[in-house]
Amino acid sequence: MNELDLLLRAAGRMMLDYQSPKVFSKGHHADFVTEADIAVQSYLVDALQKAYPRAKFFAEEEERHVLTDALTFIIDPIDGTTNYFRRRRCSMISIGAVENKLPVFSGLYDPYANEMYLAERGKGATCNGERIRVSDTSLDKALIGFGSAPYYEELFSLTGRTVSTLLPKI
């Protein structure tokens, strides 16, 4: 996990080095990519390919979106691109690894807050080296947030069904 920590921190420095990155539309009116997204993703894929030469990649800024049973890295080089180029300081770098379509480990780094989240299957999760856990709060007392996958119409109904299932329980 130390290698993942170092890799994410280096990518975070790279992300912050772009002061006014060029912004490109990905086709949808609210779906963007910046030159920083492309550079950070390239850096991450290159570094991970050297360490794991047989690995596959499911990277946001490319069309490599096939999930197999092989070790696969799922990468969002700048999660929160719109916030990033609008300087809202609410973006992070996300890497997950799955094998046989099951999570193996993941890392999320927020370079603005210098917060590193690392998790490994069977070993738990940490934030800046401190163990974190889910609470034992019952669902009817919980606060729940969710994303809506706004760029993928095929996921709209799944989001709606999920929210419809949860709402009566909170």
Please annotate each region the language model reported.
Residues 69-73, 93, 104:
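Short loop/turn microsegments at loop-to-beta-strand junctions
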Residues 96-170:
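Acidic beta-strand-loop-alpha-helix segment within the catalytic core
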